[in-house]
Amino acid sequence: MTEFKPIKEGKVREIYDNGDSLIMVATDRISAFDYILKNKITNKGKVLTQMSKFWFDYTRDVVPNHLISVDNKDMPEYFQQPEFEGKCTMCSKLTMLPIECIVRGYITGSGWASYQENGTACGIKLPEGLKESQKLPEPIYTPSTKAELGDHDENITFEQSITVLEKLFPGKGEEYATKLRDNTIALYKKCAEYALSRGIIIADTKFEFGLDEEGNVILGDEMLTPDSSRFWPLEGYEAGHGQPSFDKQFVRNWLKANPDSDFNLPQDIIDKTIAKYEEAYEMLTGKKL
């Protein structure tokens, strides 16, 4: 059996070269505040992989994506070992673009903190009188740079994203930046509408895109998982305060309340976290893992 070594290790994912494709493994690691926590969340990698597959299939008519297969039998023999079960994505090779494409449909988190200070979210002027967790009149696109492991992502304007891409792809910066923005908004609108019908509010999310060999913009990485998105229950939603969530915010809140934890979660928080991830998956897809 050929053994594989990762060519790249992120906070949560490991990437392996499979010749004309890549194998992306979603581990059970969890990160918060740009740090990898000491604990693993059992089954988390499976939730991320299967939820991304659901959304990639659902949005293929909007934007092409990198998904080839998540079926275990399609993987090289090495990835058919039990530890990889349900966590592997075979995907197309892309030249990834160094922009985190963030879209916000509701005012919360860092956007809410910024709005309280100066009436903007990531430099975008918003209407006066908004309450915390309120739905925005239209989703806003707030890109950021992609940080290396251990560094923090940095918010940038749309114009700055053009500059970043123009340096890498002379003559193509504005075209690529515009596609990233328009694709991000289109994907969010389609998926947020569907999620509402399943009882979940997608408050915000992030996408990552790359280029194929022909220079086409292709959706990559993960899609609308509890790691990359804020999911709130529609039932009981009311603007004016923070919302309960099905996502990593639960872990972030515990860490904020326990600053001396040294990024070490107690077992009950681990159990509640995976229960929330699995509940979100079942509500959105109508399937059990």
Regions from the PLM with identified roles:
Residues 1-148, 261-289:
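Active-site loop/lid in soluble adenylation, ligation, and acyl-transfer enzymes
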Residues 21, 96-98, 198-202, 214-217:
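Coil-to-beta-strand transition motifs
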Residues 33, 112-113, 214, 228-230:
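Intrinsically disordered, low-complexity acidic/polar segments
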Residues 93, 194-195, 199, 209-211:
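Short, conserved, surface-exposed binding loops centered on an aromatic residue
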Residues 103, 202-223:
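Conserved metal-phosphate-binding beta-hairpin within the catalytic cores
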Residues 117-118, 123-175, 219, 223-284:
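Anionic ligand-binding catalytic core segments
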Residues 171-203:
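A long amphipathic alpha-helix within ATP-dependent nucleotide-binding catalytic cores
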